[in-house]
Regions:
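Charged, low-complexity intrinsically disordered terminal segments
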Residues: 1-169
Length: 171
């Protein structure tokens, strides 16, 4: 097995530069072919939303994995308010079936092509303002190793049970 090259990225009220948000954005911009985002609470700030949609516009295959229904009422509405913009940009949104809650938190870039220098981040940080600035969080950056392959396999397992959101119904 390949050795994993890891770096811990802490964040919280004592970190005024929002290191997790900056690293999430950096990984999104790093993606060349494929980007996978997985978060139970995907409520991006303007910079992350712009980074993700721009990745689509430059030809990156972007997948977002979320719960079909979040376990918190307000989060569910906040998260779903971004779906139209994401779908219009070309993001493929996969919803983990209700009543289960997808609680994994990770991002992978270019996992299918080792020549593209795949990267992965996982940890306690959701992709929302609370995790980026209010809560104390720890995220691990994986720059090399078989952990990236394991997360890519996890994505395949999720995709097998998820429903793809193709459009929003407006009533």
């Amino acid at each position: 097995a390949d050795a994993n090259h890891l770096q811990i990225i802490p964040s919280g009220p004592g970190y005024t530069t929002e290191p997790n948000l900056r690293m999430f954005n950096s990984l999104v911009h790093h993606a060349k072919d494929r980007l996978v985002l997985c978060s139970p609470y995907f409520v991006p700030d303007e910079s992350l939303l712009e980074a993700v949609t721009t990745a689509c516009y430059r030809g990156v295959d972007v997948e977002l994995y979320v719960s079909a229904k979040a376990d918190q009422f307000m989060v569910n509405h906040a998260q779903s308010s971004y779906y139209q913009a994401l779908l219009e940009a070309g993001v493929r949104i996969y919803q983990f079936p209700y009543p289960f809650v997808l609680h994994s938190k990770f991002i992978i870039t270019d996992p299918d092509d080792p020549g593209r220098d795949p990267l992965c981040m996982f940890g306690s940080s959701n992709m929302d303002p609370r995790s980026f600035g209010l809560n104390y969080e720890s995220t691990m950056l994986v720059a090399k190793g078989d952990l990236i392959d394991q997360f890519n396999q996890l994505v395949s397992n999720y995709r097998a049970v998820c429903h793809q959101l193709l459009s929003l119904i407006h009533i």
